[in-house]
């Protein structure tokens, strides 16, 4: 099981939001590149980057910061936020990003997602961001009438092989992941599931390993010091052999 540190970027700075609320934002660093270097130095094998401005506007905004990260670290970077057009996805991959996360487009443009999966294969991750079990879009500002489990089924039918599941009410709240929802999504021989939102301590990591998720994205707990990355990595490796 892989531990993936998160770097959320707004206006070029590394920040964290509480439950996706832009009005409840904490700035942790002015230089996201320095943060990426720190996580790499502490043993990260992958970094999860979110362009928050892009998520809200629908087009990538922090391109320079993303490029600087991919050019600086020697580990893979996955990127989400505002990637709702084929040309933007292609451009992100051209920046050196290994995988991109498609969220809003999975709801509103199924044909686009089908094309992206056909063109880029496993470099496409479907982001399922849920509020009370229903998928949220547009930087989490709109809650749809589509259940997270239904979207997962639809995307798997199109060929998606990897999902990131985020429970919005837990994101940035350090209240624990939604173990029940994650357990519903993890299936033998099914798409890989990466857990995100609410991870606050090492016991959460042990429980996620038991559920069988492929990876765990950790944000706020790393920035507050609640979790020390090398410890989290060691526990993930021990728990999953």
Swiss-Prot record:
BP GO terms, sorted: L-histidine biosynthetic process; L-tryptophan biosynthetic process
GO CC terms in record: cytoplasm
Keyword set, alphabetical order: Amino-acid biosynthesis, Cytoplasm, Histidine biosynthesis, Isomerase
Record field: catalytic activity: 1-(5-phospho-beta-D-ribosyl)-5-[(5-phospho-beta-D-ribosylamino)methylideneamino]imidazole-4-carboxamide = 5-[(5-phospho-1-deoxy-D-ribulos-1-ylimino)methylamino]-1-(5-phospho-beta-D-ribosyl)imidazole-4-carboxamide
An example molecular function term from Gene Ontology annotations: 1-(5-phosphoribosyl)-5-[(5-phosphoribosylamino)methylideneamino]imidazole-4-carboxamide isomerase activity
Enzyme class: isomerase
Active site: 8 (proton acceptor), 129 (proton donor)
Superkingdom, natural source: Bacteria
Cellular localization per UniProt: Cytoplasm
EC number: 5.3.1.16
The protein's annotated pathway: Amino-acid biosynthesis; L-histidine biosynthesis; L-histidine from 5-phospho-alpha-D-ribose 1-diphosphate: step 4/9
InterPro entries per the UniProt record, alphabetical: Aldolase_TIM (IPR013785), His_biosynth (IPR006062), HisA_bact_arch (IPR006063), Isoase_HisA-like (IPR044524), Isoase_HisA-like_bact (IPR023016), RibuloseP-bd_barrel (IPR011060)
Family: Belongs to the HisA/HisF family.
NCBIfam families, per database record: 1-(5-phosphoribosyl)-5-[(5-phosphoribosylamino)methylideneamino]imidazole-4-carboxamide isomerase
PANTHER family listed in its UniProt record: 1-(5-PHOSPHORIBOSYL)-5-[(5-PHOSPHORIBOSYLAMINO)METHYLIDENEAMINO] IMIDAZOLE-4-CARBOXAMIDE ISOMERASE
Name this polypeptide is given: 1-(5-phosphoribosyl)-5-[(5-phosphoribosylamino)methylideneamino] imidazole-4-carboxamide isomerase
Organism (species): Chloroflexus aggregans (strain MD-66 / DSM 9485)
The encoding gene: hisA
């Amino acid at each position: 099981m892989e531990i993936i540190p998160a770097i959320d970027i707004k206006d070029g700075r590394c920040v964290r939001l509480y439950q996706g609320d832009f009005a409840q934002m904490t700035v942790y660093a002015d230089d996201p590149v320095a943060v990426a270097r720190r996580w790499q130095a502490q043993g990260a094998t992958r970094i999860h980057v979110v362009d928050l401005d892009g998520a809200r506007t629908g087009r990538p905004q922090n391109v320079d910061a993303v490029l600087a990260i991919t050019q600086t670290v020697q580990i893979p970077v996955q990127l989400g936020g505002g990637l709702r057009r084929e040309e933007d996805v292609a451009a992100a991959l051209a920046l050196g990003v290994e995988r991109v996360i498609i969220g809003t487009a999975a709801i509103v443009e199924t044909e686009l997602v089908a094309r992206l999966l056909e063109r880029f294969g496993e470099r496409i991750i479907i982001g399922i961001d849920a509020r009370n079990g229903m998928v949220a879009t547009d930087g989490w500002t709109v809650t749809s009438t589509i259940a997270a489990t239904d979207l997962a089924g639809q995307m798997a039918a199109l060929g998606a092989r990897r999902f990131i599941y985020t429970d919005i009410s837990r994101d940035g709240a350090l209240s624990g992941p939604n173990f029940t929802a994650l357990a519903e999504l993890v299936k033998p021989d099914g798409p890989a599931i990466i857990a995100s939102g609410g991870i606050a301590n090492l016991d959460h990591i042990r429980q996620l390993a038991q559920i069988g998720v492929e990876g765990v994205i950790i944000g706020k707990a790393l920035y507050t010091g609640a979790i020390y990355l090398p410890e989290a990595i060691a526990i993930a490796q021990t728990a999953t052999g």
